[in-house]
C-alpha cells in the first residue's frame, strides 16, 4: 500500500492544499493528522474555491475519502460549516468523511484565553487566536474534552468544570455543554474509534496532509514563534494513531519566502519589492487575512527543513509570480560572526545572521531556459529533484517532471 505525505518546507502558506488535492487522485484517502482551524488550505477548482481549515484537502469531485485523526483539535463550528460547504458543492460528499472520536474539541472559551495570553506576552507570538494552543495545553494537562466524551454528558460536564478550575475562569458550563452536544449530534454518524479507523485505513493508499510548515513545528521550528504541534513528518504517527511507514515525503516550497506573524525572517524584504511580491502573489493569510511578510528564497532554511523532515521529493509553487523580475536573488548562506555557513543545526540564532545572496537571471516564461537554470541550481544545492512544478492557482495548473 502506498503511503505518502505532503509537508511545507517554509513557514506554511506554501500552497500545500492545491498540491494535496491534485495528488489525492492517486490515493484512497487523505489524512489530517495535526493542527486545527489555524490551518488554511485554499483549493481552486476553477468554477469555485474552497478554503479547508479542518477538512482534508481531498479531491471531493473524485470521491476521495477524508480522515481527521486523533492528533487534530476540532472546532465544531468550523467543521460543520465546511461540511455544509462540500455537501452543497458535491451532494453526498459528507459521507466521504470520518473523524476520530479521540480528537480533542476546541471550546469557545479557548479563543478568548488564546487572545488574552498572546496579548499579555512581552513579545507576542502572533497566533491565529483560534484556541489551538489552549486545546493542546489542556490535552497535555489531561483536562481537555474529546469528541467521545459527549457520549456521556456527565463526563463532558466534569471536564468543563475542570477546565474552569484549571484556568481560574468562570463560564456557564451548562450553556456551553448544551451547545456543544447539539453540534456533536450533527456529526455523530461520522465518528469512528481510532483503532477501528486504523483497521480500515492501513490497507489503503494514504496521503498525509501536513499543516503549516517545518519552520513552524513546535520542536524543530523557529521557537518560540511556532505553532503548538509537530506539523512536520514527526507528527504523522501520533496524529494518525498508528505506526506507519511513509515512503514518499513531498516537501512543498514557494519560489520565494513568506511568513505570517512574528519571528525571525532572514531574507525579509521591508521595501517596495516585498510589497510587490505580496501584491503579485496575493499574500494574505487564508485563515486570518493578515498580510504575509515576503522575502527571497532561503536555501539554508530549506536545507534544514529537508534534513529534519526526511523529505525525499520537492514541489515548487508560485514560480509564476516571479516571472518578469530581471534578477532573482537566492540566499545561499549566512554570515555569522564573520564566518560563512551554508547549513545550520538549529534556528535559535536567526536574528544574528546576515544572508548572503547569489543573483541569477530572471525569466519571462516558465518554459524558458532561465527558469530551467533556476530549478537546476536549486536541485544541485539541495541534492533533491523536483517532482512537480505548480504553474498557477488552479488544481490542473501543475507540471510533473
From Swiss-Prot:
Amino acids binding substrate: 286-292
Chief site of localization: cytoplasm
One GO CC annotation: cytoplasm
Annotated coiled-coil segments of the chain: none
Record: residues binding GTP: 12-18, 40-42, 292, 318-320, 390-392
Active site positions, chain numbering: 13, 41
Gene3D superfamilies on file: Adenylosuccinate Synthetase, subunit A, domain 1, Adenylosuccinate Synthetase, subunit A, domain 2, Adenylosuccinate Synthetase, subunit A, domain 3
Keyword line: Cytoplasm, GTP-binding, Ligase, Magnesium, Metal-binding, Nucleotide-binding, Purine biosynthesis
GO biological process, one term: 'de novo' AMP biosynthetic process
Disulfide partners: none
Cofactor: binding details: Binds 1 Mg(2+) ion per subunit.
GO molecular function: adenylosuccinate synthase activity; GTP binding; magnesium ion binding
Positions bound to Mg(2+): 13, 40
Subunit-structure text: Homodimer.
Family stated for the protein in its record: Belongs to the adenylosuccinate synthetase family.
Function field: Plays an important role in the de novo pathway of purine nucleotide biosynthesis. Catalyzes the first committed step in the biosynthesis of AMP from IMP.
Protein name: Adenylosuccinate synthetase
Organism: Pseudothermotoga lettingae (strain ATCC BAA-301 / DSM 14385 / NBRC 107922 / TMO)
Lineage, top ranks: Bacteria, Thermotogati, Thermotogota, Thermotogae, Thermotogales
Gene this protein is translated from: purA
